[in-house]
């Protein structure tokens, strides 16, 4: 067996410098001033109106309104995420993603989904106390459909390279 010393001397070493992780992102104010940026902000505002108007009613009594809520809340959250990505120029950190095509597909699918949600909403507006809420949500649903259709058009132009692309001049082609 080995003998262990009665005393042990220890030393305190200096701590390693702490490392921080930072993402340097710049806010693209030009995107906010562009037509696609204005459309995206309008889609977020109108989408919020659609789902809050329906959520303020007893929507669980009409099954079709569940679909409208699903579409409106899902696309509202995805639009907010897209706004953050484009506003902070985070898409430039992912050059392998074909952003013009992604935007074209997103907006086209969103327009189609909102069209189905509008039809379901408009077909189920009952008379009575909540008629105003559901009628207004149907109106804003078709407005949202038109906004997403307009965004699809600008995304198509950006994808084809025939004009300003879907996120101003910031999306790499």
UniProtKB/Swiss-Prot annotation:
Disruption phenotype: Pllp-mutant zebrafish show defects in intestinal absorption, and the intestinal epithelial cells contained enlarged endosomes. The pllp-mutant zebrafish exhibits abnormal apical accumulation of Crb3 in the intestinal epithelium and show reduced Notch signaling and defects in intestinal epithelial differentiation.
Residue ranges occupied by any MARVEL domain in the UniProt entry: 31-160
Source domain of life: Eukaryota
Residue stretches spanning the membrane: 35-55, 68-88, 99-119, 139-159
A GO cellular component annotation in the UniProt record: myelin sheath
Family, similarity comment: Belongs to the MAL family.
Free-text function comment from the UniProt entry: Main component of the myelin sheath that plays an important role in myelin membrane biogenesis and myelination. Plays an essential function in apical endocytosis. Plays an important role by activating the Notch signaling pathway, which is essential for cell differentiation and results in correct patterning of the intestinal epithelium, particularly of the posterior gut absorptive cells.
Protein's UniProt name: Plasmolipin
Lineage: Eukaryota, Metazoa, Chordata, Craniata, Vertebrata
């Amino acid at each position: 067996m080995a003998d262990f010393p009665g005393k042990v001397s220890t030393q305190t070493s200096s701590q390693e410098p702490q490392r921080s992780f930072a993402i340097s992102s710049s806010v693209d104010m030009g995107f906010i001033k562009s037509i696609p940026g204005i459309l995206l902000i309008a889609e977020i505002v109108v989408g919020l109106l659609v789902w809050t108007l329906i959520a303020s009613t007893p929507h669980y009594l009409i099954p079709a309104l569940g679909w409208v809520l699903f579409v409106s809340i899902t696309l509202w959250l995805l639009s907010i995420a897209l706004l953050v990505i484009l506003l902070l120029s985070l898409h430039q950190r992912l050059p392998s993603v074909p952003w013009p095509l992604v935007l074209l597909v997103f907006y086209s699918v969103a327009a189609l989904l909102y069209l189905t949600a509008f039809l379901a909403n408009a077909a189920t507006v009952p008379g009575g106390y909540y008629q105003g809420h559901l009628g207004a949500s149907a109106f804003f649903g078709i407005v949202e459909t038109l906004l997403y259709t307009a965004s699809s058009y600008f995304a198509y132009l950006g994808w084809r390279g025939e004009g300003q692309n879907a996120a101003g001049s910031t999306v790499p082609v």
